[in-house]
A protein has these predicted regions:
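Predominantly soluble domains enriched in secretory-pathway, periplasmic, or organellar proteins
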Residues: 21-463
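Positively charged n-region of N-terminal signal peptides that target proteins for export
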Residues: 1-7
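Bacterial N-terminal signal peptides
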Residues: 8-18
Length: 463
């Protein structure tokens, strides 16, 4: 079978797993997705830290549209995730439902898209609220796009939905970065113990009738389709790289052979899936690639939200050995039955701590890896509340944290959040900066999108 990528991806993956050890640059920026507000918000990091800018939008330098407007002037797009290229000159933005008008599209299962954006233009105030940063847009290859991994020449894009439904996906697309063409597609196995699945072939062959799937969660019929959410790359002691996905539909984590996927093989899961507390969402590899942290966000089958993160041992997972879930840590709440809805995770550069955004309990957890692997109940070493000032209507709404990132010097965590409001409402999202030494919020930026999800930190402004 002919490979669909050059050998350069191996060198890139080694670089990806290396830990950066540089100081935060003077010109550093936070790039936050606006989600229901289809723009990327560029925030001056150091301006955000100035006390006079706290609880204001003053540190926002520009807002870049992710799609050209409709001909009638309506803004479109649904940016939920953002990842930078190797040289940080290009941003790849995942639009969960593609070029939709969020005031019209009020359900799941929109066709995903990728916005390719010039980072330098995203930072220029004169291009505020324009599409001047958009270089091109292309189809993501399926429905409900969310997870994204950047490889040399290629993108891996996971999809958690099917056409106009919240259930029904088992697809991860492999997209050509230059042309936007779909070069291959990973097809994941259906089902998990106790859940019968329709007679639907994997890999797919035509003609096959479309499956009947639940419209939206919660629904007890969830459990057949994995519905992969975020994805991450882990590094085995065998020198190979493995793709992990958090499967919201089947409450587990898949491990896949990336090399086989890049050779064009559609079926690449190589070991039994690892069950977690409930449907996972955010997933991230440790800086050395040996561990995968994943959140247990919510069940698709019942009205239940999780309160744990799982730490997956890559070597045990890839070999199917017992104990692949090396640790499970309760976060966000002291109540074993409490519902925290952990959303995403980020690692500190030294790999010692994991930052967790807990949506339902409106706080951010810090988990110590060493204590977690020792099954110490004190592994959650800090729990930091995040709050918001009043919105334009005078109401003080919960923080609802979602996205997470950590600066390369390990000093600060950055968290995005905020409630989902009517798409016509003024920007209501929030970005918090947390000092990881004092474990306290040191800056709050307001007016960042509507229900913002993913974000990233840019520490070397392109020329």
């Amino acid at each position: 079978m002919k490979s669909i990528v050059p050998a350069s991806w191996l060198a890139f993956l080694a670089l990806l797993l290396a830990v950066a050890d540089v100081a935060l640059a003077d010109e550093s920026f936070i790039l936050a997705t606006g989600r229901r507000d289809p723009r990327i918000y560029a925030i001056d990091f150091n301006a955000a830290l100035k006390p006079r800018n706290n609880n204001t939008p003053n540190a926002i330098v520009s807002r870049a549209k992710v799609h050209p407007d409709r001909l009638d002037g309506t803004p479109v797009g649904d940016p939920a995730n953002i990842v930078l290229s190797e040289d940080h000159r290009t941003a790849y933005v995942v639009n969960h439902h593609g070029a939709v008008n969020n005031a019209e599209f009020l359900q799941h299962g929109g066709r995903g898209s990728i916005s390719v954006m010039d980072v330098g233009r995203m930072l220029r105030p004169e291009f505020d609220n324009t599409d001047r940063a958009v270089e091109r847009n292309y189809d993501s290859g399926y429905f409900g796009a969310v997870g994204l991994v950047v490889l040399p020449d290629l993108l891996l894009v996971s999809h958690s939905e099917n056409w106009l439904t919240e259930d029904g996906s088992n697809r991860i697309s492999i997209i050509d970065r230059k042309t936007g063409g779909r070069r291959a597609q990973i097809e994941m196995a259906l089902g998990h113990p106790g859940h019968a699945c329709p007679d639907f072939p994997v890999p797919f062959v035509s003609p096959t009738p479309p499956p009947t799937v639940p419209f939206e969660a919660p629904d007890p019929r969830f459990g057949c389709w994995p519905n992969p959410e975020f994805i991450a790359l882990g590094h085995g002691s065998d020198g190979r790289t493995y793709l992990f996905s958090g499967n919201a539909g089947t409450d587990d984590v898949s491990v896949m052979d990336l090399h086989q996927a890049l050779m064009g093989a559609p079926v690449v899961e190589i070991a039994p899936r690892i069950p977690v507390q409930t449907g996972p969402f955010g997933i991230k590899a440790s800086p050395n690639g040996k561990f995968i942290a994943v959140t247990a966000r919510e069940s698709g089958q019942a009205d239940f939200e999780g309160n744990t993160i799982s730490i997956i041992d890559v070597d045990r997972a890839r070999t199917g050995a017992p104990g692949a879930e090396a640790a499970r840590v309760r976060v966000g709440t002291d109540d074993p039955n409490g519902q925290a809805r952990p959303f995403t995770v980020a690692w500190t550069p030294d790999g010692r701590q994991i930052i967790v955004a807990n949506y339902r309990t409106n706080n951010v957890s810090i988990v110590d890896l060493r204590l977690a692997l020792a099954h110490d109940p004190r592994a959650e070493v800090a729990r930091i509340p995040v709050t918001r000032p009043a919105d334009a209507d005078g109401l003080v709404r919960p923080g609802r944290p979602k996205g997470t990132a950590v600066t390369s010097d390990g000093r600060h965590a950055v968290v995005s959040g905020g409630p989902r409001l009517d798409p016509t409402a003024p920007p209501s999202g929030t970005v918090w900066v947390i000092d990881l030494r004092t474990r306290a919020v040191v800056a709050t930026v307001t007016g960042v999108g509507n229900d913002p999800y993913g974000l990233t930190i840019l520490e070397d402004r392109p020329d």
